[in-house]
């Protein structure tokens, strides 16, 4: 038995494992990948980007005349193109760090390209390549979610907006995918380091106070925050793990909880798979002989938020 000097018989508590300090936020390595662009409009936009985009569009005030719009991190063009249909005299400047994404956007723009639609490949972080007070409306659908420094990006969006112009952004809030994280937390029982990393990861998702703090720091006025949750349905664990939305998105962060412990990661994800499958097959069975037992989907909640504000006059 180990003892503390001067205190015979007192046992020394075993040091608890400590998680390494959080690493600086890293950009999604798939963000500029052509494989992501190839499936974005078919597999990701309908269930992810479009619900956020509709929320954004609902908060944009009407524009009259030859307004100049800016869409930052425009992906494949929407909802910026929707704004153009609302504003027949406006022109749209849209930027995104992904060349393959912009190639899709160019095809969708059709004859409007270089007439009312102007697309540019730009990193977007940490500074936008535009003069101050240049745009009548500035939007970013999920741009803050994809930014490694969202508070700085919001400041840039404010800087390039004209005095009095509206700035409208969307992003998911803390609590998104809560059902999955609850299951994962259970599977991490006894893995203290991974549990600490998971806690840090969950805290990295912004809450309402965080977003309001970003808006205040950016100097925005008339701040309104609308929260409109929606749900995603997955047929089971395999459908979840291999859904492009997950595979090219948060799966990277989930794997990073295990650092280089590939064996531990595999064990946890296999156990998690089995637990999800168990949940999906626990639907009430119909009377014998009528039809096979029904499965129920895995439901994940997305806490979608839209920040609408204006640059002060």
Tell where the protein language model's regions lie, with residue ranges.
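A short acidic, Gly/Pro-enriched loop at the edge of an enzyme's catalytic core
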Residues: 127-138
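Conserved catalytic/acceptor-binding region of the Class I
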Residues: 164-236, 248-254, 303
